[in-house]
Amino acid sequence: MNNIKIFEEKQAAYSFSKRSEFYALEPIGIGTNRVEGLVSYLRRLADAHNVTLHALVSYIIKLHPNQSVHPKHTYYPILRNGMSKTMGLVVESLEELRLITNPKNMTMLPWENVMSYSKLFTKEKKWCPICLEEWKNNGIKCYEPLVWGINLLNICSQHNVKLHQFCSNVECRASQSSHHEKLPIEYCQICNQWLGINKNLELKFVNKDIEKWNVWVADNLGEMVIKISNLKIPKNNQVYCIIDKWIQDFFQGDRRRFCYEIQIDNNRLQLIERGKYRLSLNSLLLLSYRTKLKLNDLFYYGIES
């Protein structure tokens, strides 16, 4: 079968059997603004094989074709869909195994040349109770979309409600840690309360006229993950020229005003231009908001104009 890979590994080292069948699950939401994050996919894959996420990720990295890139330590933290070296190794190994197509597009790795990883993801999970309820009612496996983990996102553009971060059980009210491997993800990690629609839940609907910034962020992030496979991400050596073009065309060469609008200081801008730092997602979205250009269009503008 094409979707089955045979694992050969020492049982003492991993939780897998000596010879076990590795079934590739289908990622959820591909091509939509709610594409599944790779960590969510790996959690489901680990659960399907009755192993921990740690064991699965360790095993996948060991299968990387280039032995010289294997980390020397035995613990491989992969808790967010970010731009870490570990995530890069997992993506490359999955591509080699051909379990899923373009696993990189289920992470933020395509943006690593232009976007800072710092504070990109939350430490606590966020979710839309209506999404969970709809998936349950439609027989869809509950999962975590890539955008839910992004720090700046706080609304569900699909249902126009605030994302939730705490259990609705009045005797619990616990946040849900991203470090927790507990499945299924639709139940509280502490009290096992259903996190979808329930009698204790208070939905907070978004007034789009008041929360224009949050709506802009949600729409931009949704479009970003939809088009990520076709986006021309600039290379490192192009970033300086693109930033200079933004300053000249949108701010008439006024570097001070540019820094003010995207909330950085001039020293940080100089370091970014020299390739020492990258712009944060917050700064990129602020620039997008001020210029009224979608985040994706900003980089097309810089490359093609």
Segments (PLM) and residue ranges:
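Intrinsically disordered, low-complexity basic tails/linkers immediately adjacent to helix-turn-helix/homeobox/MYB/SANT
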Residues: 289-305
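Hydrophobic micro-packing sites on short alpha-helices
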Residues: 283-289
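Short linker/helix segments within small regulatory modules
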Residues: 143-151, 178-185
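A structured, charge-rich N-terminal accessory region that forms the first stable segment of a protein
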Residues: 2-136, 142, 147, 293, ...
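Residues immediately within or flanking Cys/His clusters that coordinate Zn2+
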Residues: 125-128, 150-153, 164, 185
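Residue-level signal for the short linker/turn that defines the boundary of a DNA-recognition helix
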Residues: 252-254, 279-282
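Domain-exit/linker segments immediately C-terminal to small folded modules
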Residues: 157, 161-270
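Recognition helix of helix-turn-helix/homeodomain-like DNA-binding domains
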Residues: 263-279, 301-304
